[in-house]
């Protein structure tokens, strides 16, 4: 499309220039006529000189002369040419400017000139590496990019300038006082909406984030300035979260970016973990709680690097499709002992049960509804023992095991990957009579060999139900980073959470309730701790699973249950009420599986998912059910099964039972109600 547009523009200017040349020559012949200039040589030289000067805005035959000529002219031809010439005097210099610009652009292809004239969105990127190159390559027309990196080579700097990107080759962390203020002016901080911290060092990214909280920069930056920070180190991430939470009322908006996490989220969005069951599922009119309880997940992860670990953590959130479906994850790696020890730091052993003898991690039904287990296998997949293992732990009908219904090969080595795929294909063919028309999703990492990746994509029949896990180039772009729909949904969930306090002191005040919803959503989000933000992002991501489960009966009754005169909650505009003002009566309704079957199942499902997610973030339960949440110790009394959570009890002093938190598990249904209401 751009090429066609450029061709049309070039043709337009060429025709305009040709017209200008023709008119200038015609007027030259009339003005420098043979009577006044009898010598042909000088006559032609005057005509050419006038033409050259006309294209430089200094024609010998000016407007004053033309006005006299037109006034005294008796010939229609001379009059028409005269008027055309007066117009061309202004057109010719423009043609010259376009021609000069085109030549410069072709010789020195620098595109940065246009930012002087166009109001563009200002984005500042700190660091320069392969990930930043991918981000920059996705820049849109009205985005002005600034790259800040002291280690840029001259060749890299020239290449960036040629592509219209502003370069700041300096170490900003050493700047102080006025120097820092001048740096802010150079990167146009006052007009900046997003700052991307993408250095490969998480510690350096943290230092830059801290720099923007200095007094010299705090007042200059926009109120809505947002930071995207690349951080794939859990320890550094916790430090940054603590720093943000400590200053959260004045801290800049912060979102962590992990490339392995982006890849896994993209994979699960296209190929959900429940595909094996949903591939033969027919949407029904009526709710059937028992059907979803059979949607067990048996996930095989081969290769336990960052990608494999991220998939396991995401499976703890996205694998929950009912309050009781079994989740079993088998992980295979040749260096399992070291990787398992590192991965175990994600969990708290007061909540998650570690069995070193069996190489297993389990969350028991006492801690959360349903069953969840991870089994680690230390082996080299090139050997026969891998084939034996597949048949032992993945055979249909095996005791507590069953067929693998989702497989991910997360190995970087291409030869090992292809060998593993061959074994998995044999395994699936062995049990094709059991699988039948169902789809066993097989994701494979192939970014190291694009040719092989394209072959797999084109020959999905040969490698049955195999798909390639998106490489970083496909999941990393400025558009997806800035316009993240998941983040928008997370803010809505966070707002719903804040409006369910009923008769609590922090319930929305009338003046707050009168504010526009978009304003309230942003205000509530800005003052939330990072762990609450992460929790809301997790529930927003899982919403796709719940939407798949919502049959027609559910959608038809949302208004009756949550509308202005709802049976469960009452919609009061920008906040919710429970007309009976009694938390225990609401819990009775949520537990009434006969009267409210799908509501009862959805709240249990959501509570189980929340428990697993919090466990993956290192949180633990506490023995004292009346104890307040302890953020520093990552302790929460609500991390228990539903029966324990919904226990009733009398207030003990200032403490109260955690049953009042059951209402928060209604949030996914309330979000769906709001979406339906908005349509």
Where do the PLM segments sit?
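ATP-hydrolysis module of ASCE/P-loop NTPase motor domains
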Residues: 26
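Short, flexible domain-boundary/linker segments around small modular repeats
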Residues: 631-641
